[in-house]
Amino acid sequence: MSELKALSFPFIEQKEYFNFRKTGIYEKTNDRGEGTFGKVIKVKNIKNNNEENSNIFALKICKKWERSNEILSTEIMELSNLKEIKRINNPYLMKYVDCKINDKNKEIWILMKYYPIDLRAYFNDNLNKSNIINESFFKNIAFQILSGLNSLHKNKIIHSDIKPENILYDPQRNIIQITDFGLSNTFSFDIHHKCNLSGGTYAYLPPDILLGNLFLFTSLDIWSLGCVLIELCTGEIIFKGNNYLDVLEKIEDIFGPLKRLLPGYDILALKKNANLTKKECPGKGLINYIKKYQKIKFSNDDFYDLVSKMLCIDPVKRINAEDAMKHRWFISSS
């Protein structure tokens, strides 16, 4: 008689559950994505079997730490910041619903409201549809982001990693959520805070940071947002590069020699790249770049003026979030 073999049914998916003491048990529905520090999955609360959006959540599972007494510092920083952000209570800042340190699996779970798409994906899908993305819609999105940043900055928090993927969007409610606060920094001074920036995406970092400045201004977030707004209206990453020297070159292509624009800064990074130190000619110009690639039609030059103030090379002269919200682009009708 032939040996009996155990039958397996690969088409039957094993359900996965996550238990939180305060808010109950959640069932995994699908994966959303994975990044450097972990993955995000879509879950639903099994207490309610309806399919309403209010029952759907996003669960961030932070990667396992190697030693039993070691917890990922980035995630602990994010938990700390999320508690502060919940206190701030701005409608455009992502708040956590529940959190848990799972000692058994050596993971950190952060439960948040579910938002179906990020700004990069939404604009990539709809940028050429003028009936969906026009100046009025774009202006509303920009104002929401500035409102969130203004609340952070007034509470002495610098996000430090503003990019399209970290701004989620709900098309049904037309509301954004700034998320991913793992790199955020709190500062105790009204002007700046000295610390090491260990993360962030090069393409969205200002030249003063790329040149080695350790003083983090709130203007870091404003530069990043300026880059984001240009990307959303053009479909192009304006300062795309493989490393920080590439990004500095792209910045010089637009603005001209940084050694002239930031004479008081340590230009060690410039000395490492001959292409940067030899540049003498003026840049192509920010407004010229936007007008060349823009896919959103603007009624006047107000938007160009705002992003020019946001992408001011000197961080001290860069517009702040509160003043940006009062800019004439938001006041004028479009």
What are these regions (language model features)?
Residues H153-Y169:
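Catalytic-loop of the protein kinase fold
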